[in-house]
Curated annotation (Swiss-Prot):
<keyword id="KW-0597">Phosphoprotein</keyword>
<dbReference type="GO" id="GO:0000287">
    <property type="term" value="F:magnesium ion binding"/>
</dbReference>
<dbReference type="InterPro" id="IPR024084">
    <property type="entry name" value="IsoPropMal-DH-like_dom"/>
</dbReference>
<feature type="binding site">
    <location>
        <position position="241"/>
    </location>
    <ligand>
        <name>Mg(2+)</name>
    </ligand>
</feature>
<dbReference type="InterPro" id="IPR019818">
    <property type="entry name" value="IsoCit/isopropylmalate_DH_CS"/>
</dbReference>
<feature type="binding site">
    <location>
        <begin position="270"/>
        <end position="274"/>
    </location>
    <ligand>
        <name>NADH</name>
    </ligand>
</feature>
<feature type="binding site">
    <location>
        <position position="213"/>
    </location>
    <ligand>
        <name>Mg(2+)</name>
    </ligand>
</feature>
<keyword id="KW-0560">Oxidoreductase</keyword>
<feature type="binding site">
    <location>
        <position position="181"/>
    </location>
    <ligand>
        <name>(2R,3S)-homoisocitrate</name>
    </ligand>
</feature>
<dbReference type="GO" id="GO:0004449">
    <property type="term" value="F:isocitrate dehydrogenase (NAD+) activity"/>
</dbReference>
<feature type="binding site">
    <location>
        <position position="183"/>
    </location>
    <ligand>
        <name>NADH</name>
    </ligand>
</feature>
<feature type="binding site">
    <location>
        <position position="282"/>
    </location>
    <ligand>
        <name>NADH</name>
    </ligand>
</feature>
<dbReference type="GO" id="GO:0047046">
    <property type="term" value="F:homoisocitrate dehydrogenase activity"/>
</dbReference>
<feature type="binding site" description="in other chain">
    <location>
        <position position="128"/>
    </location>
    <ligand>
        <name>(2R,3S)-homoisocitrate</name>
    </ligand>
</feature>
<comment type="function">
    <text>Catalyzes the NAD-dependent oxidation and decarboxylation of (2R,3S)-homoisocitrate, (2R,3S)-homo(2)-isocitrate and (2R,3S)-homo(3)-isocitrate, into 2-oxoadipate, 2-oxopimelate (2-oxoheptanedioate), and 2-oxosuberate, respectively. All these substrates are intermediates in the biosynthesis of biotin and of 7-mercaptoheptanoate, a moiety of coenzyme B in methanoarchaea. Is also able to produce 2-oxoazelate from (2R,3S)-homo(4)-isocitrate in vitro, but this substrate is probably not physiologically relevant.</text>
</comment>
<feature type="binding site">
    <location>
        <begin position="68"/>
        <end position="70"/>
    </location>
    <ligand>
        <name>NADH</name>
    </ligand>
</feature>
<comment type="pathway">
    <text>Organic acid metabolism; 2-oxosuberate biosynthesis.</text>
</comment>
Length: 347
């Protein structure tokens, strides 16, 4: 039996992850082991990622992560983000973030009251390098100057770019686009683009590249230009949040953090302390992350069933307030669960 280490974290992480676990347990048999992490954990134990949680994560085959609240800058000395620590610790170098409106973009635009959404059907996958870039956390103060090191390695670039091409081919995608700022960041992004241009020659699939600033505009104006995007850590973080607006917001944005030996699944959204405890957080991103989990373990039909259930809820406006509905977090989880149960019974 596969072991899943569940780390709910802070805020709405504690509300959406239980809904995801309901779906996980309905569709498979897993041993659930729970760990703690985040700001509450820091206040309780003096450590945002206790050793006990690390050991449980090591023991598990898969990690399911909620969301964490970070302390304010300067509030905690030498603070290290638990999620970034886990990504580095387990070499989870590929962050896969699907941006998909299930072919019902116009409907989502109406129910979510996003006026700029139209009938365009969005199906983009952003693949973000997950262990390098500015997120290595090498920052320092020299007198009155703050300095951050941006680390881009050939090994890290090759690894994520090959992953993107392999992902595209395996999933019958049509194109891989490299997003960079090599015209200014000539050494760091220059290396990333150089590696992309070397590797693309070995794959029989369309490949191109765009500057990150023009990409930010074209994601909104011409999202149909993009299929699979591969990019560096910070650009991927920013662009995927921006792109989520095309599909109704972060409440519909799942993600997978994949390494050679382990994977971690999490919603893209944060802990949302402004709505925590109100029971109105959208659990769909967490539940869609479970769909990605089933894809990862080779049970794509279960992942597809989850996505079908989410689409059903969107079409029938069985959604939380962020998407224009009036259901509670638990209600949406129950609606998705009931749809899955009916389908499994042949209804």
């Amino acid at each position: 039996m596969m072991k899943v280490c569940v780390i709910e974290g802070d805020g709405i992480g504690k509300e959406v992850i239980p809904e995801a676990i309901k779906i996980l347990n309905e569709l498979g048999e897993f041993e659930i082991i729970k760990g703690e992490a985040g700001l509450e954990c820091l206040k309780k134990y003096g450590n945002a990622l206790p050793e006990d949680t690390i050991e449980k994560a090591k023991e598990a085959d898969i990690i399911l992560f909620g969301a964490i609240t970070s302390p304010k800058p300067g509030e905690v000395k030498n603070y290290k983000s638990p999620i970034i620590t886990l990504r580095k610790m387990f070499h989870l170098y590929a962050n896969v973030r699907p941006i998909n409106n299930f072919g019902i973009g116009q409907l989502i635009g109406k129910i979510a009251d996003y006026e700029f959404l139209n009938a365009k059907n969005i199906d983009i996958v952003i693949i973000r390098e997950n262990t390098e870039d500015l997120y290595v956390g090498r920052e320092r103060l020299e007198n009155d100057t703050a300095i951050a090191e941006r680390v881009i390695t050939r090994k890290g670039s090759e690894r994520i770019i090959r992953f993107a091409f392999e992902y595209a081919i395996k999933n019958n995608r049509k194109k891989v686009s490299c997003i960079h700022k090599a015209n200014v960041l000539r050494i760091t992004d220059g290396l990333f683009l150089e590696v992309f241009n070397e590797i693309k020659k070995h794959y029989n699939i369309e490949a191109d590249d765009y500057l990150v600033d023009s990409t930010a505009m074209n994601l909104i104006k011409h999202p149909e230009k993009f299929d699979v995007i591969v990019t560096t850590n910070m650009f991927g973080d920013i662009l995927s949040d921006e792109a989520s607006a095309l599909i109704g917001g972060l409440g519909l944005a799942p993600s997978a953090n994949i390494g050679d030996d382990k994977a971690l699944f999490e919603p893209v959204h944060g802990s949302a302390p402004d709505i925590a405890g109100k029971g109105i957080a959208n659990p769909m991103a967490s539940i869609l992350s479970i769909a990605m989990l089933f894809d990862y373990i080779g049970e794509k039909e279960k992942g597809d069933l989850i996505r079908e259930a989410v689409k059903y809820c969107l079409i029938n406006k069985k959604v939380t307030p962020d998407l224009g509905g009036d259901l509670k977090t638990k209600d949406v989880g129950d609606e998705i669960l009931n749809y899955i149960r009916k389908k499994l019974k042949g209804y």
